[in-house]
Design a protein with these regions (language model features):
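Short, compositionally biased
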Residues: 87-101, 105-111
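Low-complexity, intrinsically disordered Gly/Pro/Thr-rich segments
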Residues: 116-127
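Short acidic low-complexity segments
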Residues: 79-86
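Short, positionally conserved secondary-structure boundary motifs
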Residues: 1-67, 99, 106, 110, ...
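C-terminal interaction segment
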Residues: 125-144
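Structural motif
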Residues: 74-75, 89
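Short, well-ordered loop/turn sites that connect or cap secondary structure elements
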Residues: 71-72, 85
Length: 144
């Protein structure tokens, strides 16, 4: 039996004025341009990833079922509850009393919660299950 995981949710604090420097033209993955040495602006990560503060939450990934989508154990998800669920979107779902993060696959008679790791099986959700699509994942923040 799979161990149940608990997600801990956090609210964004967009009032925080702790902006950090952002290289204005991006970081070159090839040869850098000397002309771009001093093009910098300030950015708030909360303001950059939060579009609807009242409906946005953060949660950490627990497990390996979504590694193929770039969601690794311990990554921080940005979740927007105001977005409509759509086929192919990655969503945080509450299924039969447990939270999970999976890719949505909407069929005519059911919803499939698709893992992005072949070691995990898709979960078919139908009228016999309790399903709440809690929010849509919009960004993932990770350590490198």
């Amino acid at each position: 039996m799979k161990k149940a995981t608990t997600l801990h949710f956090y609210s964004p604090d967009t009032s925080n004025k702790a902006d950090v420097w952002l290289a204005g033209e991006g970081i070159s993955a090839g040869f850098p341009s000397p002309a771009d040495d001093f093009k910098e602006v300030r950015i708030s990560l909360d303001r950059a990833v939060v579009k609807n503060e009242a409906a946005t939450f953060y949660a950490r990934v627990a497990g390996q079922s979504m590694v193929g989508a770039g969601l690794d154990d311990g990554d921080l998800l940005v979740i927007d509850r105001s977005l409509e669920p759509e086929d192919g979107k990655i969503a945080v779902c509450f299924v039969d009393g447990e939270f999970t993060v999976k890719r949505l696959k909407v069929a005519e008679d059911c919803v499939w919660l698709m893992p992005e790791n072949k070691q995990y099986k898709p979960l078919q959700v139908n009228e016999e299950n309790e399903l709440i699509i809690w929010g849509i994942v919009t960004h993932v923040l990770k350590a490198v």
